[in-house]
Amino acid sequence: MLYGIGRRRMMERPHFDIVASGARMRAIRQERKISVKQVMEYMGFESTQAVYKWEAGKCFPQADNLIALAILYRVSPMELLIEEDLVSSSSHIWGNVA
């Protein structure tokens, strides 16, 4: 049997906890002493709205934005996300992306 992240089979699609992932993004940003405004400017956004939505667990960043955040925060993109089976959550959130 092939296994990927954790004990999930490699061919199984991972599900991420949107609220816990947002909290992780906020915690890492704060640990790095980076302001929301600095993230906005780095990303080339006109407002902070997207950053606040990600951190509030309203939606996930698009793949290119997730990679840019990871570069800014000096972590891997996977370090910004928390799998659902690692927290007690029953909601599936695929489709919420901004």
Residue ranges and their predicted role:
Residues 2-15, 71, 81-98:
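Short, charged recognition helix plus adjacent turn
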Residues 16-19, 61-68:
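Conserved N-terminal glycine/acidic-rich loop preference
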Residues 23, 33-34, 46, 61-64:
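Residue-level signal for the short linker/turn that defines the boundary of a DNA-recognition helix
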Residues 30, 44, 56-58, 85:
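Residue-level detection of the helix-turn-helix DNA-binding "recognition helix"
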Residues 32-53:
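Short alpha-helical DNA-recognition segment
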Residues 54-55, 65:
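DNA major-groove recognition helix of helix-turn-helix
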Residues 64-79:
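DNA major-groove recognition helix of helix-turn-helix/homeodomain DNA-binding modules
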